[in-house]
Amino acid sequence: MKKFAAMMLALAMLFSFAACGGKTNAPTTAPTEATVKVEGTMEELLNKVVEINPVEFMGGTMPIDLTDTSEDGLWNIKYNTGLDNADNITEAAVFGPMMGSMAFSMVMVRTAEGADVKAVAEGMKTGIDPRKWICVEADEVMTAVSGDVVMLIMLDSASGLTAQSFVDAFNTVRGQ
């Protein structure tokens, strides 16, 4: 618990170093579908997407603990995925900047068997806070669906990156 709190405080401190700037939020959804179970862990898939569509910042991939149902654990799930709980997902991971205050977050979740994948994607898109970094805001928010995996990407387009390029890389990883 103390490690989690220290990590969250360190992340908040890192994100607070940049000046506050305002952007308008224009979320969109670009769903794709497949009927097969996606192979690989969420961390592996995130890393493959970044290999195809490299970023110019030091980023890292972290699994999201879905078993922690404490207040802090549920906050972490909501903060990263936009979902209120892990009822419809079995695995999740996030890729983001390790230092600095950048509006960038890419999350992948594996949906539970029988879960409505499109509903999970919509819940992520509508539940995520594009201003979660306080001083910066994502102006591009997209989700993509492939089989039992949902990817959520949000970023500030002023960074020179586009959410669509990450959706395209996700589709390449999936062979679509």
Predicted ranges, named:
Residues 98-99, 135-176:
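A short, solvent-exposed beta-edge/loop patch
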Residues 38-97, 117, 121:
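Surface-exposed, low-hydrophobicity interaction/linker segments
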Residues 1-4, 8:
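Positively charged n-region of N-terminal signal peptides that target proteins for export
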Residues 21-24:
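Bacterial signal peptide processing site
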